[in-house]
A protein has these predicted regions:
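Structural beta-strand segments of beta-rich domains
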Residues: 3-7
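Solvent-exposed loop segments of extracellular immunoglobulin-like
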Residues: 13-26
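Short solvent-exposed capping/turn motifs at the termini of beta-strands
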Residues: 11-13, 71
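Extracellular beta-strand/loop-rich beta-sandwich domains predominantly from IgSF
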Residues: 34-84
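Short acidic/polar alpha-helix capping motifs at helix-coil junctions
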Residues: 16-17, 31, 47
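Flexible inter-domain hinge/linker segments at boundaries of tandem extracellular adhesion modules
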Residues: 24-31, 71, 82-99
């Protein structure tokens, strides 16, 4: 049995525009995400929003879900992670990166 997980990750204040990458454990799940961005002209920075939709099951319990913001100015990236607790009621998480 699987359950749909919806998670949003937001990177603000990037220049140049960041790309958001998703991993679940060691698995790249970025292809399950949609990304949109806006350019803030006054500061010449970008806000990027990535919405991940993924079917998780019991085997995903305890796995680390990571959103990583990367651009040429920060090639090592900035990231945040949560540990999945698949046995509990599902919630929607929102990650916000600020410069």
């Amino acid at each position: 049995m699987t359950k749909r997980l919806d998670v949003t990750c937001t990177a603000t204040g990037s220049r140049p525009r960041a790309t958001l990458q998703w991993t679940l454990g060691q698995k790249d799940v970025t292809s399950n995400a949609t990304e949109q961005f806006s350019h803030i002209t006054a500061s010449d920075t970008y806000t990027v929003i990535s919405d991940l939709t993924y079917s998780v099951g019991k085997s995903d319990n305890g796995q680390m879900l990571t959103c990583k913001a990367v651009n040429v100015a920060a090639s090592s990236g900035v990231q945040t992670s949560i540990t999945l607790n698949v046995s509990c009621k599902f919630k929607k998480y929102v990650f916000i990166f600020r410069n």
